[in-house]
């Protein structure tokens, strides 16, 4: 059974509750109970609590469970101090700042998404009420080292600079969740539209993104969609994107040429018999070589000049245009970044 984890939003909320209790009572709790957006409760372990004369700070170690979350292991801090009234929440060290339109958070604000922001504020108000305290609070969420971790996320592409985002719609991290990736794709498209782009490049990995950026000299925004090609095309059309350039490697291109929308190896491997029949359809010599190949990349040197990959790209375009009437082009790169289609 996979082990679930908790979002950065849940961690920040728990740290906030522990810090308020510490500031008000002097108690340093080892764990706190917080209410998740699902209305369920979760008990979160507290890493550390520090109490000073005019503030208290508590921390929670981010645990993403079995999900390969780059924020796992980060320490999320909440520093709280009393004010005259209201609940003010901002980001400190390691929390990103939004610089572009199209995200749930307005430019200039800390990258604390709406659901975790509500969690933090609601928990703060409930905790004050439990303690019979009528003053306000200033709450600063931080994550030392978040600036470096953020470079491994899509934050820089989304225009979130300087740190991680405080995220979570359910409060729980589902292991190996594809939902978070799909959500980031949609966000990136909205940012592109808000930035007045009507053309985006959908890449199937970090290498194709690097090659596409170099080829187009960063003229269009690149979005790493992984295997979610069909999903991304539909969302692009819904969000007003007019033109899509698919940048991929030969293996994934062959799957698109077959009519697949999800190119994950979990769903299907490369069909070399299909590629062989493609080669026969354009009278390629030595097509028998394809039957004994282990990878599509191994065919590049032998068949690029024979038009095999140009046909592959054309078939991929025909299939992908059936998903939406959006204008679609397909570019295939070899392992060295050369365009072979």
UniProtKB/Swiss-Prot annotation:
- From the UniProt record, give the pathway where this protein acts: Cofactor biosynthesis; adenosylcobalamin biosynthesis; cob(II)yrinate a,c-diamide from sirohydrochlorin (anaerobic route): step 6/10
Regions annotated as coiled coil? none
Asked whether the UniProt record includes Transferase among its keywords, one would answer yes
From the Swiss-Prot or TrEMBL record, what is one GO molecular function term? Answer: cobalt-precorrin-5B C1-methyltransferase activity
| Pfam families associated with the record | CbiD
Q: Which reaction does it catalyse?
A: Co-precorrin-5B + S-adenosyl-L-methionine = Co-precorrin-6A + S-adenosyl-L-homocysteine
Q: Biological process GO annotation list? A: anaerobic cobalamin biosynthetic process; methylation
Identify the domain of life: Archaea
Listed EC numbers: 2.1.1.195
Keywords assigned by UniProt, alphabetized: Cobalamin biosynthesis, Methyltransferase, S-adenosyl-L-methionine, Transferase
The entry assigns this protein to a family as follows: Belongs to the CbiD family.
Q: Which NCBIfam families match?
A: cbiD
PANTHER family with a match to the protein in the record = COBALT-PRECORRIN-5B C(1)-METHYLTRANSFERASE
Query: What HAMAP family does this protein map onto?
Result: CbiD
Instruction: Please state what the protein is called.
Output: Cobalt-precorrin-5B C(1)-methyltransferase
């Amino acid at each position: 059974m996979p082990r679930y984890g908790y979002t950065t939003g849940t961690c920040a909320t728990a740290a906030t509750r522990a810090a308020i209790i510490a500031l008000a009572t002097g108690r340093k709790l080892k764990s706190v109970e917080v209410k998740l957006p699902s209305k369920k409760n979760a008990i979160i372990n507290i890493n550390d609590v520090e109490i000073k004369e005019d503030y208290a700070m508590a921390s929670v170690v981010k645990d993403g469970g079995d999900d390969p979350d780059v924020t796992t292991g980060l320490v999320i801090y909440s520093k709280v101090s009393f004010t005259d009234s209201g609940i003010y929440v901002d980001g400190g060290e390691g929390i990103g700042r939004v610089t572009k339109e199209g995200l749930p958070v307005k430019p200039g604000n800390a990258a604390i998404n709406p659901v975790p922001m509500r969690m933090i504020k609601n928990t703060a108000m409930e905790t004050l009420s439990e303690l019979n305290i009528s003053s306000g609070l200033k709450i600063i969420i931080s994550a030392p080292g978040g600036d470096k971790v953020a470079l491994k996320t899509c934050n820089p592409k989304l225009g979130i600079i300087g740190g991680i985002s405080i995220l979570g719609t359910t409060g729980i991290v589902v292991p190996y969740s594809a939902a978070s990736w799909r959500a980031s794709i949609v966000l990136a498209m909205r940012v592109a539209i808000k930035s007045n782009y009507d053309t985006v490049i959908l890449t199937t990995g970090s290498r194709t993104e690097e090659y596409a950026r170099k080829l187009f000299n960063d003229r269009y925004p690149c979005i790493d969609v992984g295997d979610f090609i069909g999903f991304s095309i539909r969302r692009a059309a819904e969000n007003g994107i007019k033109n899509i350039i698919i940048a991929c490697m030969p293996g994934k291109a062959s799957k698109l040429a077959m009519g697949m929308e999800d190119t994950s190896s979990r769903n299907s491997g490369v069909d070399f018999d299909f590629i062989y029949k493609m080669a026969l359809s354009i009278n390629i010599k030595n097509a028998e070589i394809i039957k004994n190949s282990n990878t599509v990349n191994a065919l590049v040197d032998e068949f690029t000049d024979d038009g095999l990959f140009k046909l592959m790209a054309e078939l991929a375009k025909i299939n992908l245009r059936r998903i939406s009437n959006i204008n679609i082009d397909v570019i295939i790169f070899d392992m060295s970044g050369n365009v072979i289609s």
